[in-house]
């Protein structure tokens, strides 16, 4: 079962993490597998006023980029190697001409993994921003630019034993706010529903 282990605040969004450790008796040794998950979701208005480039760390440790063309972006990656570091950041850049208006801006960013270990244990952990947080209202180009600069970075490192801790991943952004913290129930349920797992496991 998944259980919330932490809940902390962040300047722009509330960030959190949850973990699961199946402590049943040890089973016959099996091949170790690890699946990494990344999710970015934005409100409809974000793509009207900004360009979104998803920056993430893949299973080899390489930093890759993909342009976000719809309001939801999901990536699943497989590896058999631990330790590993995961990280994601939605780089949000205001469009060159943003007309005055009533924009509701929101980005939800989450990252997690499931490790099925050789000793038979299965460990899940994840980190992300609060999907229930209210959007930010913006009326001017300056408002939009200020909001774009606050897109959070989510990063974690998984030890060779399969357990994660929050870590800083440098994507070269110009905002020094931290994005640490653990996955509580709301973000846990949202995240599992996005990656095809049962939200009731939270």
Regions found by a protein language model. Give the residues of each.
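C2-type phospholipid-binding modules
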Residues: 106, 110-131, 135, 144-147
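Post-signal-peptide N-terminal segment of Sec-exported extracytoplasmic proteins
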Residues: 37-79
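Extracellular and analogous surface-interaction loops
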Residues: 28-30, 72-84, 156-162, 169-174
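Mature extracytoplasmic domains of secretory-pathway proteins
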Residues: 64-117
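Bacterial N-terminal signal peptides that target proteins for export
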Residues: 1-5
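Short, solvent-exposed S/T- and G/P-enriched segments that are highly enriched in secreted/extracellular
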Residues: 62-82, 123-138, 151-152
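C-terminal partner/receptor-binding element of secreted or periplasmic proteins
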Residues: 128-201
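Bacterial Sec-dependent N-terminal signal peptides
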Residues: 10-37, 176-185, 199-202
């Amino acid at each position: 079962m998944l259980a919330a282990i932490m809940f902390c605040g962040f300047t722009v969004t509330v960030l959190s993490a949850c973990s699961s450790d199946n402590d049943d008796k040890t089973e016959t040794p099996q091949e170790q597998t690890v699946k990494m998950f990344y999710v970015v979701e934005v409100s409809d208005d974000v793509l009207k006023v900004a360009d979104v480039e998803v920056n993430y760390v893949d299973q080899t440790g390489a930093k890759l980029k993909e342009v976000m063309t719809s309001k939801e972006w999901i990536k699943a990656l497989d590896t058999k190697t631990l330790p590993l570091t995961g990280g994601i950041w939605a780089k949000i850049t205001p469009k060159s001409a943003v007309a005055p208006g009533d924009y509701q801006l929101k980005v939800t960013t989450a990252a997690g993994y499931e490790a099925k270990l050789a000793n038979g244990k299965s460990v899940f952990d994840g980190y992300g921003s609060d999907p229930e947080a209210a959007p930010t209202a913006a009326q001017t180009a300056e408002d939009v630019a200020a909001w774009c600069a606050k897109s959070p970075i989510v990063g974690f490192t998984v030890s060779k034993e399969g357990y994660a801790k929050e870590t800083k991943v440098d994507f070269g952004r110009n905002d020094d706010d931290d994005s640490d913290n653990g996955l509580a129930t709301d973000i846990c349920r949202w995240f599992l529903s996005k990656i095809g797992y049962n939200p009731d496991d939270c």
